[in-house]
From Swiss-Prot:
InterPro entries: QueC, Rossmann-like_a/b/a_fold. Its cofactor is Zn(2+). The gene is queC. Gene3D superfamilies: HUPs. It comes from the Bacteria. It catalyses: 7-carboxy-7-deazaguanine + NH4(+) + ATP = 7-cyano-7-deazaguanine + ADP + phosphate + H2O + H(+). Its EC number is 6.3.4.20. ATP binds at L13, S14, G15, G16, M17, D18, S19, T20, L21, S22, S23. Binds 1 zinc ion per subunit. Keywords: ATP-binding, Ligase, Metal-binding, Nucleotide-binding, Queuosine biosynthesis, Zinc. GO terms for biological process: queuosine biosynthetic process. It holds the Pfam family QueC. Zn(2+) binds at C192, C200, C203, C206. This is 7-cyano-7-deazaguanine synthase.
Length: 228
């Protein structure tokens, strides 16, 4: 009897709402999921790692990578890995915010591509959001397509990897609605840039998340120190 081969996808899973939904969509799409998480010296590294592990358990993911890339703290120039720079709490501003980690998603995708090539995966899922987001330049559809081209040019000839961005043109409200529809355990996810016990409620990430729940007419299941 021939063994049925399963198609594999590498899911970049931070433990946040977007990457978690993206991973659930990969499961719905019929992929065997290999999860990748990056510890890059961010303020909420320990809390995000806990969220990642909890979500992997919920998805029954057998194969996962926890990759340490501490050099982001040496580069600095952002409020997530440079503790001398305060995380903004006054609301979303125009332009690229100080919470943007220089070329983070490009580096994440490059490392994930190496894992995909090793594992024989045909797809990589990343939960970037272009429309209703902080405006990071490495979250656009154009950037992802350029990275896909570079990855497929820079890997073995028989390696063909699709980068799937199921949320890129969704609003936060649509993300909340889709997550609820797919029974995503949103109570296990973590989005806050500042805190690890209770979400601050005032950083850009908390504001975007709370706005999404409000616009979707739903209550966020996690606790907040304060509301915007």
């Amino acid at each position: 009897m021939n063994k049925i081969s399963t198609k594999k996808a590498i899911c970049i899973l931070s433990g946040g709402m977007d990457s978690t939904l993206s991973s659930y969509i990969a499961k719905k799409d019929g992929f065997e999921i290999i999860a990748v998480h990056f510890n890059y010296g961010q303020r909420t590294q320990n809390r995000e790692l806990k969220a990642f592990r909890d979500i992997c358990n919920e998805l029954d993911i057998k194969s996962k990578y926890e990759i340490d890339i501490p050099f982001f703290t040496q580069i600095g120039a952002n409020a997530l890995t440079d503790m001398s720079i305060d995380v903004p709490t006054g609301g979303l501003e125009a332009g690229v915010p100080i919470t943007y980690v220089p070329f983070r998603n490009g580096i994440f995708l490059a490392i994930t591509a190496a894992i995909a090539e090793k594992e024989g995966a045909t797809a990589m899922y990343i939960g970037v959001v272009q429309e209703d987001s902080s405006g990071y330049p490495d979250c656009t559809e154009e950037f992802i397509q350029d990275m896909k081209k570079a990855i497929n040019q820079g890997t073995k000839e028989d390696t063909k990897i699709e980068i799937i961005t199921p949320l890129v043109h969704l609003s936060k409200a649509q993300i909340v609605q889709e997550a609820i529809k797919l029974n995503v355990p949103l109570e296990l996810t973590w989005s806050c840039y500042k805190e690890e016990e209770e979400a601050c409620g005032v950083c850009d990430s908390c504001r975007l998340r709370l706005n999404g729940f409000e616009q979707a007419g739903k209550k966020d299941p996690i606790k907040y120190k304060e509301f915007q």
